[in-house]
Amino acid sequence: MNRLPSSASALACTAHALNLIEKRTLDHEEMKQLNREVIDYFKEHVNPGFLEYRKSVTAGGDYGAVEWQAGSLNTLVDTQGQEFIDCLGGFGIFNVGHRNPVVVSAVQNQLAKQPLHSQELLDPLRAMLAKTLAALTPGKLKYSFFSNSGTESVEAALKLAKAYQSPRGKFTFIATSGAFHGKSLGALSATAKSTFRKPFMPLLPGFRHVPFGDINAMRTMLTECRKTGDDVAAVILEPIQGEGGVILPPLGYLPAVRKLCDEFDALLILDEVQTGMGRTGKMFACEHENVQPDILCLAKALGGGVMPIGATVATEEVFSVLFDNPFLHTTTFGGNPLSCAAALATINVLLEQNLPAQAEQKGDMLLDGFLQLGREYPDLVQDARGKGMLIAIEFVDNEIGYSFASEMFRQRILVAGTLNNSKTIRIEPPLTLTIEQCEQVLKATRTALAALRVSVEEA
């Protein structure tokens, strides 16, 4: 039966939500009521599938963890007052921590003046952020287009590459197996997981995939495309595959891809949505081997875990195709004052506190610990790998990975799997994680593995 719209019901919902937003704490009954409401509304109005996913990593098989607020820079608190060390980091958005005071203050100050821009007058923070990124990014990257997410930044990069290369008769894109670039139609065409792709086939034509890290396969594909007249417009890569399971390419792979792109007059698009902003021990992962892309995609941590923002940064030669008609690709909210304020403050914090170097130091500590635990539990752990504070623990099968996440949850450590590799749990905490918290994470990992060994043996 079709239901009639109800203004009264909508008004009551908004009043209830606004009341919750104002609250700092909940009593026991309010907590129970909120949990019931959230579960019901997810089931009836968001997507019931998310509830089953949440159950798979919640101790006891229930929905007890309804997120309420950030705790410290590096922790989350649920409606029951339980505090969790965040080793998931919102899939890489909290590089400067939760509610970083510098970022929050910048956004609050901008909010008091002007939340959104007029669309007609020139907005100063967009200009200042573009200038900052031109100074911060490697090579000849100079111009920035701002959006609201990583998927959008990739979509803009693909369109920009098309606009630049189409007059040259180049229409083919090469991506890699295991890649994740987003789920909008263009980005999904570059993404490599069939689960995400199949329901939306056919995707955009002209996308090819080669094994990640295999430079010979890349050369062969570029050569064959040239032979058949399907000349390559661009190669799109993650310097380290995040959702693929934190897969690091062989040393020298990225410079070799850059050289091939130059040889075949193809653009190099680097998707640093997850690896950028200090995550791997450098401001951008491509800097580990001094690789300079033609187009760089950023998002996630760029907004400091406070505001959503994406950026597509390109060289002047490539970006100039949009000079004559800047309206070829635009977005209403991209580059808005609040998001730009957050991004500028985030970059300031990353540089002032030298967080990329901290990520390298603490990441080495964590990875060394996980590798040692892997040697102690070879029946459970297949591999541990990573760079900086982008780390993966790969288990011998999917079920061990799910059980490990649940055990860590029980010890108040938040972790989760990767989208393209379900055997792999990622460790992607804020770069502000303390040494003491790193030690807690390693201790909890040891306890979780010991408990899993017992449960596997009993089974």
Curated annotation (Swiss-Prot):
- Give residue numbers for the modification (N6-(pyridoxal phosphate)lysine): 300
> Which Gene Ontology BP annotations are present?
L-lysine catabolic process; putrescine catabolic process
Example GO molecular function term?
pyridoxal phosphate binding
Function in brief:
Catalyzes the aminotransferase reaction from putrescine to 2-oxoglutarate, leading to glutamate and 4-aminobutanal, which spontaneously cyclizes to form 1-pyrroline. This is the first step in one of two pathways for putrescine degradation, where putrescine is converted into 4-aminobutanoate (gamma-aminobutyrate or GABA) via 4-aminobutanal. Also functions as a cadaverine transaminase in a a L-lysine degradation pathway to succinate that proceeds via cadaverine, glutarate and L-2-hydroxyglutarate.
Q: Identify the enzyme class.
A: transferase
- Which InterPro entries has this protein been placed in? Aminotrans_3, Aminotrans_3_PPA_site, Class-III_PLP-dep_AT, Putrescine_aminotransferase, PyrdxlP-dep_Trfase, PyrdxlP-dep_Trfase_major, PyrdxlP-dep_Trfase_small
Catalytic activity, EC: 2.6.1.82, 2.6.1.29
Where does the chain bind pyridoxal 5'-phosphate?
150-151, 274, 332
Reaction catalysed by this chain?
Answer: an alkane-alpha,omega-diamine + 2-oxoglutarate = an omega-aminoaldehyde + L-glutamate; putrescine + 2-oxoglutarate = 1-pyrroline + L-glutamate + H2O; cadaverine + 2-oxoglutarate = 5-aminopentanal + L-glutamate
The cofactors it requires, by name, are: pyridoxal 5'-phosphate
Annotated organism of origin = Enterobacter sp. (strain 638)
Under Pfam families, the record lists: Aminotran_3
Q: Which pairs of positions does the record mark as disulfide bonds?
A: none
Q: Does the keyword Transferase apply?
A: yes
List the keywords (alphabetical).
Answer: Aminotransferase, Pyridoxal phosphate, Transferase
Judging by the UniProt lineage, the source's domain of life is: Bacteria
Q: Which residues cross the membrane?
A: none
Named in its record, the pathway it takes part in is: Amine and polyamine degradation; putrescine degradation; 4-aminobutanal from putrescine (transaminase route): step 1/1
- State what protein this is by name: Putrescine aminotransferase
